[in-house]
Amino acid sequence: MDEGTRTVLRKFEHIEHCLKRNVEAHATNGFEDVHFVHMSLPEIDKDEIDLSVKFLGRKFDYPIMITGMTGGTRKGEVAWKINRTLAQAAEELNIPLGVGSQRAMIEKPETWESYYVRDVAPNVFLVGNLGAPQFGRNAKRKYGVKEVLYAIEKIDADAIAIHMNPLQESVQPEGDTTFSGVLEALAEITSSIDYPVIAKETGAGVSKEVAIKLESIGVSAIDISGVGGTSWSGVEYYRAKDELGKRLALRFWDWGIKTAISLAEVRFSTNLPIIASGGMRDGITMAKALAMGASLVGIALPVLKPAAKGDVEGVIKVIKGYVEEIKNAMFLVGARNVEELRKVPIVFTGFVREWLEQRIDLQEFVKKRAKLRFEFWNVGFYSYPYTSSSTHLF
């Protein structure tokens, strides 16, 4: 079996396990330690609340992104159906959409249609996806700017996400652990293409140290994807070929940084737009993430099942439920929009507070998340952040 065929088969297995098994983290995402202060007199009307946000030069109706999940099967097969269903929902809701890793498309070009959605979603903000290990200096087939542009332009995407998944690769039977030189390769990409580059984790969170490096090389945004949602070590547990592999994946099932903690670290240490994903399962949690300084919240697993059935309305129903919950939380803290939400009081307790007090200046973080502003202007498709005298928030 050639490498491309193995990659396609792996995509089938990942989808199957996510649909049929419990692959979520056993640990929480940490937002139970983040608290709003209820306002008995919110002094706003609920009907006037505006959930629209700006991100990478585009305005969206809601601060929610469907993050990349799958791709790599042939036309008419499951990944093709999932991406087209999600795209139609994202188009109707005017929210951004990511596709899964396009490595399969590069190795098996005939699978490209499983990522292509422009015929059903001509206006959706679409984010392509490639994996960090393929950019390592010791990768079996090293990717570069050429492969990035191919991944973007073949599906007419608006941006590219480079997913950082060392945890998954380290426990995967056929994992690629060639991560040396990735930062240098990403620096070349950000300086060479006219598209936004999003650095994306895959369920283990981004630390302040990594975030600072990513900002220094010019990435446009970070998807923190922390602990608390889908565990890719958990997925690989079910794919393991022997007891040693199962034991390794089980041991690292909950490895990483909780989403709430990662969000605070990255927000405190950088001025980059942040997608907060990792266990986003209700609108109150999403509102907390936005209040902490996230530009968008990301979801994946909650909409996978209706998407696999081709149920566009089912996907929309899930997301609209989250929207109503976010809106209600904003009403109860007196926030008319996401900018005002970042100024409401929040209180940290428990493990999250203990962690953050050792890692950042927590009081300074609370002040910074309310003051941070971004202005974007475009050169081609690339968005440059500007922070000294901005007039709008994401």
From Swiss-Prot:
GO terms for cellular component: cytoplasm. Mg(2+) binds at residue 169. Keywords: Cytoplasm, Flavoprotein, FMN, Isomerase, Isoprene biosynthesis, Magnesium, Metal-binding, NADP. It is found in: Cytoplasm. It is an enzyme of class 5 (isomerase). InterPro entries: Aldolase_TIM (IPR013785), FMN-dep_DH (IPR000262), IPdP_isomerase (IPR011179). It catalyses: isopentenyl diphosphate = dimethylallyl diphosphate. Its EC number is 5.3.3.2. GO terms for biological process: isoprenoid biosynthetic process. Substrate binds at residues 10-11, 101-103, 168. Its cofactor is FMN; NADPH; Mg(2+). The keyword Metal-binding applies. SUPFAM superfamilies: FMN-linked oxidoreductases. One of its GO terms (molecular function) is FMN binding. FMN binds at residues 67-70, 101, 129, 200, 225, 230, 279-281, 300-301. It holds the Pfam family FMN_dh. Homooctamer. Dimer of tetramers. HAMAP family: Idi_2. Involved in the biosynthesis of isoprenoids. Catalyzes the 1,3-allylic rearrangement of the homoallylic substrate isopentenyl (IPP) to its allylic isomer, dimethylallyl diphosphate (DMAPP). This is Isopentenyl-diphosphate delta-isomerase. The gene is fni.
